[in-house]
């Protein structure tokens, strides 16, 4: 008696003994319970997410203003806007107790060294919002005594346009900063410094909403929006 040995291929079609198609049946309820009660990932990601959640919801702003945009910024601390909803209402009188600075107004060259010194005294990690056209690019003051943008000597995280920006615009910039902080990956120790820090790329809002603005047909005044 002779035998022929052949290798079995489970995926190959078998004309003599046809097999039905294989389908994987999943239990959605079981999968939901597994993902709800069992974490499948790195513990480092959980710890980083918890730290970023605490950082973005407990920003300590430094009470510092330069010009008329500062009036609009302080308006955001009043009851109609209630910046306390975002955990950033505790204004600090000393830069050593703050981790968040808003450059609101015109930055003159004489003020630049003072602002930089205050920034260096702030706690790590720290963030900066440039509020208003003058802080962003010098505004209408294209003269020798005005710095043409605070990003010439400070790292800026969020730019808020306007002359001056409304309090709602400042709150939107604060929310964008919180979103960016939530995606950061940085060492958990403040002693390490800026090395090994990953910040998510933040595209301009005018680019993200370009199609939405073009599609608008009914124009309304700012008071009606």
UniProtKB/Swiss-Prot annotation:
Pfam families documented for this protein? Oxidored_q6
The entry's free-text remark on the cofactor is:
Binds 1 [4Fe-4S] cluster.
Q: Which UniProt keywords apply?
A: 4Fe-4S, Cell inner membrane, Cell membrane, Iron, Iron-sulfur, Membrane, Metal-binding, NAD, Quinone, Translocase, Transport, Ubiquinone
Q: Which residues form the signal peptide?
A: none
Q: Name one GO molecular function term.
A: quinone binding
**GO-annotated biological processes:** aerobic respiration; electron transport coupled proton transport
Reactions it catalyzes: a quinone + NADH + 5 H(+)(in) = a quinol + NAD(+) + 4 H(+)(out)
The Enzyme Commission number assigned here is: 7.1.1.-
- What are its GO cellular component terms? plasma membrane; respiratory chain complex I
Where on this chain does [4Fe-4S] cluster bind?
68-69, 134, 163
Which Gene3D superfamilies does the UniProt record give?
A: 3.40.50.12280
Q: What is its main location?
A: membrane
SUPFAM superfamilies on file: HydA/Nqo6-like (SSF56770)
Membrane association type: Peripheral membrane protein
Which cofactor does the UniProt annotation name?
[4Fe-4S] cluster
Outline what the protein does: NDH-1 shuttles electrons from NADH, via FMN and iron-sulfur (Fe-S) centers, to quinones in the respiratory chain. The immediate electron acceptor for the enzyme in this species is believed to be ubiquinone. Couples the redox reaction to proton translocation (for every two electrons transferred, four hydrogen ions are translocated across the cytoplasmic membrane), and thus conserves the redox energy in a proton gradient.
| Similarity-based family | Belongs to the complex I 20 kDa subunit family.
UniProt subunit comment: NDH-1 is composed of 13 different subunits. Subunits NuoB, CD, E, F, and G constitute the peripheral sector of the complex.
Protein name per Swiss-Prot or TrEMBL: NADH-quinone oxidoreductase subunit B
